[in-house]
Amino acid sequence: MRLILLGAPGAGKGTQANFIKEKFGIPQISTGDMLRAAVKAGTPLGVEAKGYMDAGKLVPDALIIGLVKERLKESDCANGYLFDGFPRTIAQADAMKEAGVAIDYVLEIDVPFSEIIERMSGRRTHPASGRTYHVKFNPPKVEGHDDVTGEPLIQRDDDKEETVKKRLEVYEAQTKPLITYYGDWAQRGEENGLKAPQYRKISGLGTVDEIRERAFDALK
């Protein structure tokens, strides 16, 4: 099972990624984790990546693809792997294809932006403990206060509506085109000797268990 998980920020990809990893016994490939591990290990690619990171620059796609290929050679990837948050752009998807990185499925978790804004902007956090609430779905006993300590809850900057909207705008511009990219490739079939992935789209609305069952059904 070699899989790319797509969906907007707040669509619930992280939760479903954990279920998929456990069911199929595959690792989640995070480019952030890979970069940190390569830098820490001092590999040639890691040293090169560190130069860009220290200068505050984006690590080039070619270098990230090099790290991906190294990571996929490790024994835990023998049964497959799950990409979450990569590729983010058409250029990265093209680079993966050119590098011969095989993908069986592209699974999109679809949630309307209005729902994501409500989900994320309604979150409230107790800073000292990390306990989280939601003004609609999981409200505290006393509005605006932690259930245990009674201390005030805050809204993190990341959860503010204007921040959520900006993240969704970036997703719309950069990552959403991948849905068309993989959907079109699935229809065209094999390219450059690389089998086209099957494209699946599921609704991310409902309970966590309902969405999990949809995901598993889509990957049969």
From Swiss-Prot:
Keywords of this entry: ATP-binding, Cytoplasm, Kinase, Nucleotide biosynthesis, Nucleotide-binding, Transferase
Gene3D superfamilies: P-loop containing nucleotide triphosphate hydrolases (3.40.50.300)
SUPFAM superfamilies xrefs: P-loop containing nucleoside triphosphate hydrolases (SSF52540)
Catalytic activity: AMP + ATP = 2 ADP
Keyword Ion transport: no
The protein's name in its UniProt record: Adenylate kinase
Biological process per Gene Ontology, one example term: AMP salvage
The family this protein is said to belong to: Belongs to the adenylate kinase family.
Superkingdom of source: Bacteria
Pathway the protein contributes to: Purine metabolism; AMP biosynthesis via salvage pathway; AMP from ADP: step 1/1
Keyword Transferase: yes
Cysteines paired by S-S bonds: none
UniProt-recorded Gene Ontology molecular function terms: adenylate kinase activity; ATP binding
Enzyme class at the top of the EC tree: transferase
Residues at which ATP binds: 10-15, 123, 132-133, 206
InterPro entries in UniProt: Adenyl_kin_sub, Adenylat/UMP-CMP_kin, Adenylat_kinase_CS, Adenylate_kinase_lid-dom, P-loop_NTPase
Pfam (any one): ADK
EC numbers: 2.7.4.3
Assembly, per entry: Monomer.
Comment field on protein domains: Consists of three domains, a large central CORE domain and two small peripheral domains, NMPbind and LID, which undergo movements during catalysis. The LID domain closes over the site of phosphoryl transfer upon ATP binding. Assembling and dissambling the active center during each catalytic cycle provides an effective means to prevent ATP hydrolysis.
Organism: Burkholderia cenocepacia (strain HI2424)
Cellular location(s): Cytoplasm
